[in-house]
Amino acid sequence: MGIIKFDKVTQVFGDLCVLRDITVQLTEKRIAVIGANGSGKSTFVRLINGLQLPSNGFVSVDGLDTKRDAKAVKRKVGFVFQNPDNQIVLPLVEEDLSFGLKNLNLSKDEIKKRVDEILQRYDLQAFKNHAVHLLSGGQKQLVAISSVVAMKPDYIVFDEPTTLLDLRNKRRVTQVIEELPQTAIVVSHDLEFLKNFDRILVFDKGEIAIDDVPLVAIKEYIRRMS
C-alpha cells in the first residue's frame, strides 16, 4: 500500500503563510481536496510531486523525500493542471503523448506501444496527427491526462481538471479519473463528482478543517459555507 506523508509542513510565500503545520497521511485510492479560493488546497497538492517544496517540514511519497529524491518523486507522481495549455508542449497529439515517455529511457517500440494504447483507451486515434491547438477544451484536457497516464505513475494529482470544461466534457474527464488504476488526488469544487471518493480533506485558511468520508465531509462543508 502506498503512502503520502506530510510532517509538520508549513508553506510561506513572502509574508503570506499559505499552509500551517500540516501533518497528515494519505493512503486511500481516491482522495479529494476542497476549500474556498486561497485556502491552501492547490499549494497542498503541488507539494506532493515537488512542484513546490515546503518552507518547513517534510513531504514524502512512499518513503521518498520530495526535496532529496525529487526526480524519483516526479516519476511516481503525475500532475494534471487546470488549464491543459500549461501542460501540452508539442504541436501534434502523438508528439505530445510521446514527449514525457522519451525522458523515461524507453525504447522507440515501447514508446510507440504506450502511445497507441493510450490513443485507443481514450478514443483519440482520430486525433493522432491533429494539431493540439485546434482541439476543444475537453479534448485538450484528455490529451493532457493521457500524456500523464502513459508514463504509468503510481499517483496522479489533478488540480481542478474540469473547471474550464462544459458539462459534456466535464463528464468525460470525471469518468476517466474514476476509471484510473492509479491513486488519484483531486482538487475540485464538483461535490457531486466527489461523493464516491474514499476521503475528503477540506482546507480553510491554510489548515485541514475537515478530514472525513464524503458523506460526512460534504455535509459539514456545506453547513460551514451556508
Swiss-Prot record:
Q: Where are the transmembrane segments?
A: none
The record's section on InterPro entries has: AAA+_ATPase, ABC_transporter-like_ATP-bd, ABC_transporter-like_CS, ABC_transpr_CbiO/EcfA_su, ECF_ABC_transporter_ATP-bd, P-loop_NTPase
One GO molecular function term of this record is: ATPase-coupled transmembrane transporter activity
Q: Which CDD domains match?
A: ABC_cobalt_CbiO_domain1 (cd03225)
Any Pfam family: ABC_tran
Q: Which UniProt keywords apply?
A: ATP-binding, Cell inner membrane, Cell membrane, Membrane, Nucleotide-binding, Translocase, Transport
PROSITE patterns in the record, alphabetically?
ABC_TRANSPORTER_1 (PS00211), ABC_TRANSPORTER_2 (PS50893)
Membrane topology, from the record: Peripheral membrane protein
Q: Where in the cell is it found?
A: Cell inner membrane
Q: Which Gene3D superfamilies did the record assign?
A: P-loop containing nucleotide triphosphate hydrolases (3.40.50.300)
Domain named ABC transporter: which ranges? 4-225
A single GO cellular-component term on record: ATP-binding cassette (ABC) transporter complex
* The EC number(s) this enzyme carries: 7.-.-.-
- Source taxon at top rank: Bacteria
Ligand binding (ATP): G35, A36, N37, G38, S39, G40, K41, S42
Q: What does this protein do?
A: Probably part of an ABC transporter complex. Responsible for energy coupling to the transport system.
**Membership in a protein family:** Belongs to the ABC transporter superfamily.
| Protein name listed in UniProt | Putative ABC transporter ATP-binding protein BQ02700
